[in-house]
Amino acid sequence: MTTSGLDPGAGSGALGGEELRLPRGARPERYELLISPDLSSGRFSGVARIELEVLLDLERLVLNALELGIEAPELRPGWASAGDEPGEPRSLAIELDEERQEAAFVPTSGTVAPGRYTLSCSFSGVLNDRLSGFYRSVYVDDEGVERVIATTQFEETDARRAFPCFDEPDLKAVFDITIDEPEGMLAVSNSPELSSTALAGGGRRVRFAPTIKMSTYLVAFVVGPLEATPAVDVDGVALRVVHRPGRGHLVNLAIDAANHALRFYRDYFGLPYPGTKLDLVALPDFASGAMENLGCVTFREALLLADPEHTARAEMERVVEVIDHEIAHMWFGDLVTMRWWNGIWLNEAFATFMALCCEDDYRPEWQVFVSFARRRASALGVDGLHTTRPVEFPVRRPDEAAAMFDVLTYEKGASVLWMLEQYLGRASFREGVRRYLARHAYGNTDAVDLWEAIGAEAGEVPVREIMGSWILQGGHPLVSARLLGAGTSGPPTLELSQEPFSYLPEPMDNPLAERDEGRSSGIGSSWLVPLLVGGAGGERPHRVLLGASPERVEVERGAPVVNAGGSGFFRVGYDAESLAGLLASFGVLRPLERFNLVADTWATCLAGRARLGTLAEVLSHLGDDPDPHVWSVAIGALGLLDTLAPEVDRPLVAGAARALLLPQLERVGWDPRPGDDEQVPMLRAGLVTALGTFGRAEAVSARCVELFADEVAGRAVVDADLAGAVLAVVAYHAGQAELDAILARYRAPRDPMDEVRNLSSLGRLRDPGLAEQVLGLCLTEIRSQNAPYLIASMLSTREIGPTTWRFVEAHLPEMMDRFPANSIHRVFEGIPGLGQVDAAGTPRYADQVRSFLDSAIQGARRRLVAQSVERLEANVRLARRLPAELAELGGLAPRR
């Protein structure tokens, strides 16, 4: 899955810290489910027959169930699937515990002795609108008619909302699913259709083939007005895309990418795909980005369906990455599954890393590992906070696992796997993964099982100890490099040492922060750092395992690169001599090395370890760097400075942006050229966005307004790679007419990508009155899956952030009712943009924001919001420094 799937706040309540697990006196073997959705009434009913093995003499059978009506329970000895003769049924009473989300089936007399039994019952429920469990997804078709799809999202613990079950990941079973498909509708599930019979009132009863043994959170069924593409045979696997009618022309990229992924993973893992079909299902309403249900992967439409002629390169890259991520889960997560929710990070981190490997094989020219550096930077940003957490931490209750669906799980987890792979070598790492999957297929594991398998291929490298230091404690180090003996006749020596990196020197008074065992900071003290140390220009790197004590390594003359290749998850601080050498050799560094040098410099500025003059010196060496990701660090830094600077100093930031960026836009031009590098469109878009907004380049903003007007009038179509940038600039300068035009395009989009692009641009508005209109739509018209992200974007925009914050204060209860529970905390990721201070250095908004959130946010989501509060404090402290440092940006221009 690409984002969270359960309410992070659900853990609050009377049960407190009690471990919430099912008794282990019985295990399921097989579920036979009949599911009958009624799309018109918004309800469903069903029948469950669960073959289970009772291991102990039991007074009750305890399963999970939530928001279900359960009737007619009975228990019979024997399993029909094993050919057992059915025994006499025993009647059962039902005791529901809503707080524990359990249903106890209690014999009316006696106990249940060990043996094989079949538990049967009927059940019913409501197709909810919360995008979890068995829920409704609604869209309006081309004739203006509202259409309803019934679909599922069960991770982490919402299968219990659809049918009674043993809803824990290690209680795997076979699922034999039958669905009553209304007339004119299509039903899909995890397995291929096996047979169907006509229903008396119209429609079909469709039975699907039994699945492999799998966890309940991977079960899926989707019913509605849908179409499926003809199946493509991929080495015996039937591949389809399922979509709403009229969108079949948008599936080619998905089919091509999935075809490649199935073959790539089969070869990489050395195991066949664990099934015979794979449906990729595009849904209008979906809280997560996508979900790895075995054989029936569900997606947001904009992350699956794309028109290549109207899709930017970066957008196509994202679509392929999500597809590759979910298909990787078919092996790593579905075939082999974590034992308990504390291990969900490994499923997601490994799928994130493998998606990069797969996509890099699919389109090497995209340089996806360089693209990933931007996402890794987000993880480093959170991990430099005292409110960070270990990647893996104890989970007593399933709902606590929801706090793991963040950049630390996905991006930090993937980054440390990549760091390990680069240190060991790809072949050794892959053989370890193959060993792990082969040994644990169809079973459940802990992370140490993977470390042991990789360690068996790693020689003397202490894999388990290295990974434990990165996974079981929060934070990351600043690796300091000091060059010794550079002026002597012998080879120079590089002295390496480490210390914890943090944006604030000490933890702030953060009422939302959790204190772990008396520790005020979630950042660890030292790590086993697998370093690759090389020279500028690609010298073969040395392997150095840096512990708590400093290490010295001989290096060749020239500029040393501590994070050679750029795969390490840490910051690097160079002494003045080493930094000067790297800047002199900047053009021969690899793209990731250049990215890291700029990003690490900016991070040390944010942390108060360096002044803006140091950043300006590094940025002046970018020259004509061709990589858009390197430039994105500079653009992001200047954008934040514009957000936080005193109003009187904002022209200085704008001038620095124009001096640095305008020569690059002149170099790449506005229009695609024959022979353009794959990176040029992304660079052009980033430059136009920055210059047309905080860069205050009037000619750029005027050109964007003209391009938008021509497209609205039907005179031209903006190039797909530039469309998002043009919209961002137009929204930044928008009046009522421009807002109306953007909303009209949002309501009648060309394709799902166009819808998202128009909606996202609204976060750039600067007129508070226009912002209020859009905020009102977030509670009515804008899909609940998208609204939290838009509000966060609006919070982070200087001119409308205060207006947006007042809206959040006034409407938070409504937002909590309407938005998916797993994404409400996303709203508050925008509050660091409220870090402005007055002339005396007093925060304009931060104190009231912190006070409100302390009283308004409850449960496990406080941990996530606490991180945003700490980022806000870091921005406040940066804002206090700016009057004294912004002049150091004066005259900034690239050296050539």
Model region roles, listed by residue range:
Residues 1, 10, 149, 208, ...:
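Hydrophobic alpha-helical and helix-loop surface patches within well-folded domains
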Residues 1-45, 79-80, 144-149, 169, ...:
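N-terminal, polar/Ser/Thr-rich
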Residues 13-23, 112-113, 120-176, 224-229, ...:
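Glycine/proline-rich low-complexity spacer/linker segments in large multi-domain proteins
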Residues 34-36, 92-94, 106-111, 162-166, ...:
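Beta-strand-rich interaction surfaces with strong enrichment in secreted/lumenal proteins
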Residues 46, 152-157, 164-324, 353, ...:
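Hydrophobic helix-coil surface modules that form long, contiguous segments used
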Residues 49-68, 176-182, 497, 501-532:
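Surface-exposed beta-strand/loop patches in extracellular or lumenal glycoproteins
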Residues 67-141, 201-202, 549-557:
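A surface-exposed beta-strand-loop module
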Residues 376-378, 495, 534-544, 549-896:
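Long, ordered, helix-rich scaffold segments
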